Amino acid sequence: MSNFSEVFARAQKTIPGGVNSPVRAFKAVGGEPVFIDHAKGAYVYDIHGKRYVDYVLSWGPMLLGHGDDDVLDAVRAKLDKGLSFGAPTEIETELAEKICNIMPGMDKVRFVNSGTEATMSAIRLARGYTGRDKIVKFEGCYHGHSDSLLIKAGSGALTLGVPSSPGVPACLAEHTITLTYNNIEQVRQLFRDRGNEIACIIVEPVAGNMNCIPPEPGFLQALREVCTQADALLIFDEVMTGFRLGLSGAQGYYQVQPDITTLGKVIGGGMPVGAFGGSERIMDFIAPVGPVYQAGTLSGNPVAMAAGLKTLEKISAEGFYQPIFDKTAALCRNLESAAKEAGIGFTTNYVGSMWGGFFTEEEKISNYQQVMACNTERFNRFFHGMLDEGVYLAPASYEAGFMSVSHSDEDIDFTVNAARKVFANIK
């Protein structure tokens, strides 16, 4: 059987960098990527058969865990009828109805193929609806790889050591205003000065691409207020937080209603999908009923819709979320205790089923500057140590971790015991 080095070398001959998304290449942590063969429940298995407790969960979608039998059955049933038709299907409406019934203030939703498509389309819609060009985002927040949003982006763009990407025209960058996440006064000052130029604010309600940074009290409410006063739109990028902080996402959790919401990940049950939605008044600006154009050959793919619909049906069950939230909290508390026993500066943030760990002496991490000051070298050693112990974390210190309903108390104990060993070795 080929080792990882051989498989990676082969991949690099035909795939740029050997991967189809940069963070997978392990550039941030060093070494060569683990190649996965299959997954089930809370575990992924590499091509050599080694099992890992998985806290990446395909970067968030697998809230039910990998290979949920009911989701797989729903997918198989759709597969027997064909893969794609390029025509409307009834299941698109069923999933749309389900999402609109769940998400506050969402009357209509448009399906696309990825989170990037969702945010890109939401920005275009906001500009078309308001007749304004400028958009506001926050330093370290990642909203996909469309040109307008790769300005001081988080996630993979941070691990590459650059705040944006070559190939983004300066004229687009000029229309993107970047502020500090969790800085309310900075937002208010901008809107006092230039509010009538701004089409929208786009924000991750919980920033999950500079690790896991929850909003400070009042921050999201302040965004809602300034947008309302300036007739700008507030976009919540809930590609990551959607259905992970509860059934109604971050907007339900924090009781702040955006004008447009972008979704992805969980709504496809692991299949490629994205969506954006809002009030009927705003969404009717989208073609074919409105002037703002958006289209996609594979949008609303029936197989992806089947996976998403079954996933949402299952997570809508009463009492579904609390056990996951409890396990997330227990994991974070116990990791902090293990680090303290080892004399290592380490703190965690968690909200719902999202979590993150920071190697720092600070007690609280709440913005991009603090994240960038954390000890990434120590994280890299921790990552590889945990990998050796059979725990799969995101291969970059700027990524959130995730919990699923499939993770057991034994998995949490296994993870914490592994961390104790690793903490002792990286002092």
From Swiss-Prot:
Positions carrying N6-(pyridoxal phosphate)lysine are 265
Per the record, the similarity remark reads: Belongs to the class-III pyridoxal-phosphate-dependent aminotransferase family. HemL subfamily.
* Subcellular location, record wording: Cytoplasm
Q: Which gene encodes it?
A: hemL
Q: Which cofactor does it need?
A: pyridoxal 5'-phosphate
Of the GO CC terms on this record, one is:
cytoplasm
Organism, by scientific name, is Teredinibacter turnerae (strain ATCC 39867 / T7901)
What is this protein identified as?
Glutamate-1-semialdehyde 2,1-aminomutase
> Partners and quaternary state?
Homodimer.
* Enzyme Commission code(s) on record: 5.4.3.8
- Name the NCBIfam families on file: hemL, PRK00062.1
Biological process, per Gene Ontology: protoporphyrinogen IX biosynthetic process
